[in-house]
């Protein structure tokens, strides 16, 4: 009888421990994949970039005025709508940079790198919004797993936009959180 109570007590503690661990795991997954996502707040991203990198404002204003800052959308194989900005070099070139943002950021927050490649190095640039950031769809940040396939797809888009003979660099940047 005493042994039976001990087994029941131990089993209850074990089941309770499993439930607590499962709940904590779900919370941590949700916390890491659906954080407060500054990458969805575009206006705040533009303000941050212009405040932090004041040299960007005249360049971006010029791009917008000349309709050189363009948007494009594609669909991933799993039917998620993805967005990117792109800017052609001021001179015809085969050099193209695909500049990818980090965790909880968006393409706008990579414009300082885009400026370097486009304005200083005369590259064509393409800046994608990864899943669940910027203007891209999705219900969770992927932390690189599906993003690697999306970036490959964006490289194909860059080839279509700028020509099949592009020399391409992919730069993935994680600025400080």
List PLM regions with ranges.
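N-terminal Sec-pathway targeting helices
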Residues: 1-18
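An N-terminal hydrophobic leader/cap segment in hydrolases
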Residues: 16-73
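A short loop-to-beta-strand scaffold at the N-terminal edge of the catalytic core in hydrolase folds
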Residues: 71, 77-88
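Short beta-strand element of the alpha/beta-hydrolase
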Residues: 94-102
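The serine-hydrolase catalytic nucleophile loop
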Residues: 103-117
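Conserved alpha/beta-hydrolase
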Residues: 114-137
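Alpha/beta-hydrolase active-site loop
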Residues: 141-162
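Alpha/beta-hydrolase fold nucleophile elbow
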Residues: 162-175
